[in-house]
Amino acid sequence: VILGAVGFFLIRRKVVSEEGLKTLSELVIGLFLPLLMFSEITARFNFRQFSDWWIFPLLSVLVTAVGYLFGLFVVALDRSLVSQEGPFLGIAMFQNSGYLPLPLVASLLAPDAVSDMFIYIFLFLLGFNMMIFSFGVFVLSCKGRACHFDTKDMFNAPVIATILALVVVFFGWTRFIPSFVSKPVEMMGRCAIPLSIIVVGGNLALIRIRSIQHVRPMLLGLVVKLLLVPLAFLVFVLLVKPKPLVGLLLMLQACMPPAALLSVIAKNQKAEEGLINQAIFYGHLASIFTIPLFLGLYGFFSGFFN
């Protein structure tokens, strides 16, 4: 919270410019986060211990699909949402899947469990990044008009770093990485989490909300994203009883507010930004209460935090 507040006030007080925050965000996405992913996976991942690694990208698709289906259901009930169906569905589908879960995990779990959860999250992000830059672009910009997106966007730096790390581990090449390379990579990767929280706070400060508009679609979108989706996964996890850390991963991802990337995609695709920006801003504020609520319910019924 403190780091997020620092990012927010650095931007609001113009200590850091909008261009400076953009550069910092690009460094986090393009350098520090990929290095953290590569470092953690090559140091701690092996295919025997994580034999079910391929499930995690599919879990990302599952979380997206549940949000999409809930969104379609609400649109079918309230036809006034049809005019903003794309942004509404984007809000329902895509969550802040990396910037918030990583620091939350680091603060909630013991060090050994944190390492495993980081790997789970990185594998989850493999599916998430490919989904948001393909299906996410389609949903936001292709309703009733021609659209296009560059498939190269699906293979961004975090995705490439994850795939490269898996290849290195698979062929046993980690032993050929000298310490004078692995140590700096690890040190720079550790910068990803605190910087990512500052970026989230800064991005919230950049969202310009002069007046609250699109109140009904925003509220309905946040009801889907922050209440219906986590409630559905709470029931799912309690019934299916997956491994404890897998259950926590699903609950964390299901509880997250709308992804800040939606605003970037909407701007690039010239889609409606107003609804998305408001949902991101107020969704992050509301999640201060909804995340502890659902994680508390999960811990109470599953006994995870006992």
PLM ranges: what are they?
Residues 1-306:
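Alpha-helical transmembrane segments of multi-pass small-molecule/ion transporters
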